[in-house]
């Protein structure tokens, strides 16, 4: 960014940039608060837990971040003397759905799309030698000889055929170019990650196409040549790091803006100063301040909290900005435009870069793939949520069955008061010796100890498990 040389003008410019940033930060707070209020973050966390096979009872057995009890959850330590296994049917159903969608939309070594020119009925008729009726009628009215009419029809047919062929050739070349871009940016790999997110938590976020600088190294005539090109790419965005506009409804494109969160180390942030489009003085202030956090807790793709206290939060705003604000941030804005789509980058709530949107119409370069749409929300419902009730039924049935099996594995023993173990303990061991009092009237030792067998209910409990498995198939369609 080019700063003013006059100190007063320079300070005024920075003040304008700071004011510009504060106005956008209010929109960020609205977006963050709206997503929290929607309850979708709690749903994501619950869906991630079931995918990982974690719930209240077995949380303490997990050797990971899941072991910490989230707010509002019961303490697992109070559940004793019962089975805590988690028969995870959520993960295979989620993975099966993702594989099925991926194989359908992203076939291996092929593409699931093609480009063809739009058909023009009039042009197709002319290519077959049939002139439009008004043209044919006009030539007859002015007395054009039939031979001349035939020549005109042939010439027009040749021209129409040429245009049709040219359109097909252009479509084929455009298709090849787009496919080349997809291969270079690993579009299939990124989309499979988006599909995984959608099947797991209901929503997958894809960003693109957006311009990105690609560097290629090659040897030409024995010399190393480094070539830099700007090419369109698409990439997957973690749903935890995407914040659509508050009140956008069921489509993020109904909102006027959106925010994306990313993270940078201090080293990477320092390297941005070499880019003249960044405001170096603002970056220096950010590094001096240290990392600050503005959003909700960062999660990994499996929902665990991330230790990112040494990382700087980077926020990208996509929306409409005023001409004067962009010019204060060093952006050259065309004349005659007062409001223009822009991209503004924040670090530590400071504007470090502003640029015009590469899309002239201002369309947001994001899309949310919802596995099953929710009414009035851009987020979707995933397989993990669809199968939640069957998963709980299967889990409860298996745990009760195993608890029952453990209790039915051995009998309950009832001793009369005058029966005393020789070793002073009630442990059941071979060659155990007991003493019976001489005062006891019976001479049959078996009457001094009674065995009660706990009922084995595995058959009836397995019916509950089987019903849960059948219900899982019905609710998912898999």
Where are these regions (language model features)?
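Extended, helix-rich architectural segments
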Residues: 1-352, 457-460, 464-467
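Extended, charged amphipathic alpha-helical segments
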Residues: 312-478
């Amino acid at each position: 960014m080019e700063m003013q040389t006059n100190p007063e003008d320079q300070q005024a410019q920075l003040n304008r940039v700071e004011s510009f940033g504060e106005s956008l930060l209010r929109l960020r707070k609205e977006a963050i608060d709206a997503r929290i209020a929607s309850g979708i973050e709690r749903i994501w966390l619950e869906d991630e837990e079931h995918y990982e096979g974690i719930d209240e009872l077995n949380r303490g057995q997990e050797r990971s971040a899941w072991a910490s009890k989230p707010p509002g959850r019961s303490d697992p330590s109070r559940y004793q003397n019962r089975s805590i296994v988690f028969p995870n049917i959520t993960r295979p159903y989620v993975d099966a759905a993702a594989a099925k969608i991926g194989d359908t939309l992203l076939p291996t070594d092929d593409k699931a799309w093609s480009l063809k020119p739009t058909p023009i009925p009039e042009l197709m008729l002319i290519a077959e030698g049939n002139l439009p009726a008004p043209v044919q009628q006009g030539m007859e009215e002015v007395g054009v000889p039939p031979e001349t009419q035939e020549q005109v029809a042939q010439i027009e047919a040749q021209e129409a055929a040429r245009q049709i062929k040219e359109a097909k050739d252009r479509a084929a070349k455009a298709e090849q170019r787009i496919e080349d871009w997809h291969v270079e940016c690993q579009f299939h790999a990124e989309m499979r990650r988006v599909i995984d997110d959608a099947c797991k938590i209901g929503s997958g976020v894809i960003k693109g196409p957006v311009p990105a600088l690609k560097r290629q190294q090659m040897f030409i005539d024995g010399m190393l040549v480094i070539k830099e090109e700007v090419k369109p790419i698409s990439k997957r965005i973690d749903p935890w790091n995407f914040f659509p506009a508050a009140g956008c409804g069921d489509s993020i494109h109904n909102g006027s803006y959106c925010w994306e969160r990313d993270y940078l180390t201090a080293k990477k942030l320092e390297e941005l100063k070499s880019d003249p489009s960044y405001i170096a003085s603002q970056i220096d202030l950010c590094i001096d301040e240290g990392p600050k956090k503005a959003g909700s807790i960062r999660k990994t793709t499996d929902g665990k909290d991330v230790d990112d206290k040494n990382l700087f939060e980077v926020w990208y705003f996509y929306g409409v900005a005023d001409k004067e604000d962009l010019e204060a941030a060093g952006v050259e804005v065309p004349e005659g435009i007062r409001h223009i789509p822009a991209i503004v980058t924040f670090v530590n709530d400071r504007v470090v870069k502003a640029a015009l949107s590469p899309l002239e119409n201002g369309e947001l370069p994001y899309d949310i793939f919802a596995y099953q749409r929710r009414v009035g929300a851009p987020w979707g419902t995933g397989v993990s949520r669809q199968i939640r009730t069957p998963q709980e039924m299967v889990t409860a049935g298996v745990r009760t069955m195993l608890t029952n099996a453990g209790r039915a594995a051995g009998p309950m023993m009832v001793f009369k008061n005058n029966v005393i173990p020789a070793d002073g303990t009630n442990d059941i061991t071979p060659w155990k010796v007991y003493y019976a009092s001489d005062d006891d009237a019976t001479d049959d030792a078996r009457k001094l100890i009674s065995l009660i067998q706990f009922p084995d209910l595995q058959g009836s409990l397995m019916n509950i498990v089987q019903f849960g498995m059948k219900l899982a198939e019905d609710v998912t369609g898999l």
